[in-house]
Structure formats: C-alpha cells, structure tokens
A protein has these predicted regions:
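Structured, basic alpha/beta domains of bacterial-type, RNA-associated proteins
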Residues: 1-12, 19, 23-118
Length: 118
C-alpha cells in the first residue's frame, strides 16, 4: 500500500520522470514561461525553486549542483548570470502557476502556464 507517499509520479518510471523534469526546467529557464499540464507544472515548481535558490550563489559548487540536473551549458550560464542575481533579494516564490480555462482537446487534461516571477 502506498499510504502517505507524497511523490508525484506522473505515470512514468524514475528515469523518464527525471528526464521530463529536466527538459521542462530547461524550457522554463530559456523561455521564462511555458504551457504544460497542471500536474506537470505542480511537479516542476519545487524543482525549479530549488535550482534558482542554488543559483543565487554563483560559485563552483553551485555550478556543479546545477550540472547534475540541467544538461546544456547556456542554460546553466543563464541561471548563474541572469536568473540567480535577479532573485538575490527574494527568499522564495520564484514561479507562478496560472490555470487555463478549459481542457486540452486531445486527452482532456487540465492545462496551466508556469512562469518565472519578474
């Protein structure tokens, strides 16, 4: 029985879920606003918040911690040089989830926009 298990699985195994979250995080960092399902947005939010908090200190350890999750160099560079300093004085709440009215046509899933707070 899975009582009191809080992990959001998104109906994927661990490797597929990790890859999906990494790709969504990179897209959110590059475009600063993405449209996805509500469940994926809610799963992505804590991961991105922790990455931004890590990027606020732009030292070698922070770079290596970001490299564990994010794969492309330009995304890591943007995190350390642009996004980290932008939220230097903010303690948390770097992202916002906006629910979209109506459901997706193909499968009826609820959609949402997740964006970085300016």
């Amino acid at each position: 029985m899975r009582h009191q298990k809080k992990k959001i699985t998104l109906d994927r195994n661990k490797a597929a879920r990790r890859s999906l979250m990494a790709n969504l995080a990179e897209s959110l960092i590059i475009y600063e606003k993405i449209k996805t399902t509500k469940a994926k947005a809610k799963a992505l939010r804590p991961m991105v918040e922790k990455l931004i908090t890590r990027a606020k200190t732009s030292d070698l350890h922070a770079r290596r911690e970001l490299m564990k999750v994010l794969y492309t160099d330009n995304v890591i560079k943007k995190m350390l040089e642009v996004i980290g300093p932008r939220y230097k004085d903010r303690e948390g709440g770097y992202t916002r989830i906006i629910k979209i009215a109506g459901n997706r046509v193909g499968d009826g899933s609820e959609e949402a926009i997740i964006e970085l707070v300016k």
